[in-house]
Amino acid sequence: CCNSRIIVCFSSTNDPTDPWYIYSLTGNPLNNNRWTDFPAIALSETGLVITANLIIPNVSWQVGFDGSVIWHLNTSEGFAGGNVNATVYTQIAHNGKFVRNLHPVRGHDNISDQLQFLSNRNFDLQNDTIFLITLTEGTSDTTVTAQALISNVPYGVPPNGKQGDTDTTDATKGLQTNDGRVLGAIQKDGWIQFVSTTAHGANANAGIYHGFIANAQSPDPKLT
């Protein structure tokens, strides 16, 4: 686990055959014998963020989760081959419980107006809470805040997907769906739309959860 790394590459020009600037981020940022899993990225005008999960070694990712982190890098410096000022934000939690699988919200044109992240309780049989995490870039300081939003439509961990030859009497058969984490999100004009897998129809089938957050960058976002 101590050799776990995230490798980040910035192009020096718009010609991919020209040299690249390569940076290495430790997969054990807290120096506590953890490794990094499931990275995801988003961009703002000035920053690159990379989210990831920290995993305890020698156990499954399901039970070995030990917090999600956000790396923030300066893109201007990255494209110039300079000091990207890589900063990692950890211990992201709500009511003392880690917020898991932080999914970066991408701008509709791939550039985020505001760096934000979504999460949920992806292993719960039923839950109505979506977590909205906001990273505010500043010239001298960067802050991370978390809000819990309540949905009028609950979600739940999905069962395995049923295929034509699936034995429906055995819940372990079928296409494994893993869990109900948020796996897609975009923002535009102050709103966020996002999707995840979910249980549908008295937990009988796997379905798609489509959420909408209005006024997502305001102090009072609304989830439907």
What are the residue ranges of the model-derived segments?
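C-terminal PAP-associated
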Residues: 1-224
